[in-house]
């Protein structure tokens, strides 16, 4: 794959960001597989209720809303979480609709962090971390930023879809890709035509003389 040009003028390979995306996608796929197990569905609501315990009083309406909203249809929401995580994982690995995938995954991760992980709290004595979903959101934000600076990714489904669907870059890229430029010194169609015409004229002139 062609290296990306950075501000310093040095060329850096573009494959590391693709390796990060695919590796992160594999991690998400493993996590998604676990969401399809019966244990996740059976303990889904208990996990949210457990995180609501000990939270500050001003957060009580937030957790009450999600508990009351999901409780009548717990199985549906448990399956929905499994489906969303699976789709995100597959999109990451394949490099499909990357911009939409990254933004959707950021929103989804923050929602998980604010419900099933209780914002990483309650932050009392003995608390040791702020939750994993917020870290996932940061990684997705980093991937989104990398896609802005590195541009299209050859190791992705988007790269090939963009060749066939002109507007797909709006789904896949954070900015419009620059038009492909011919390498320096490479003959263009116009140059080749002009050269051919010049050679033909020169040949006719020699014949005339």
Give residue spans per PLM region.
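Extended, low-polarity transmembrane helix blocks
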Residues: 1-84, 94-209
């Amino acid at each position: 794959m062609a290296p990306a040009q950075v501000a310093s003028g040095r060329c850096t390979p573009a494959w590391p960001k693709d390796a990060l995306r695919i590796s992160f996608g594999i991690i998400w796929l493993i996590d998604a597989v676990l969401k399809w197990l019966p244990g996740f569905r059976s303990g889904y609501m208990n996990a949210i209720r457990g995180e609501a315990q000990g939270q500050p009083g001003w957060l009580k309406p937030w957790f009450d809303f999600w508990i009351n909203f999901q409780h009548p249809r717990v199985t549906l929401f448990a399956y929905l979480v499994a489906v969303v995580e699976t789709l995100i994982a597959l999109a990451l690995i394949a490099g499909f609709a990357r911009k939409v995938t990254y933004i959707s995954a950021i929103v989804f991760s923050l929602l998980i962090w604010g419900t099933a992980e209780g914002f990483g709290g309650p932050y009392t004595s003995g608390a040791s971390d702020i939750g994993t979903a917020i870290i996932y959101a940061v990684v997705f934000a980093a991937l989104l930023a990398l896609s802005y600076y590195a541009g299209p990714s050859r190791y992705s489904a988007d790269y090939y879809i963009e060749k066939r669907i002109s507007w797909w870059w709006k789904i896949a890229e954070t900015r419009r890709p620059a038009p492909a430029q011919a390498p320096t010194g490479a003959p263009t169609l116009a140059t080749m035509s002009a050269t051919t015409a010049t050679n033909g004229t020169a040949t006719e002139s020699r014949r005339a003389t």
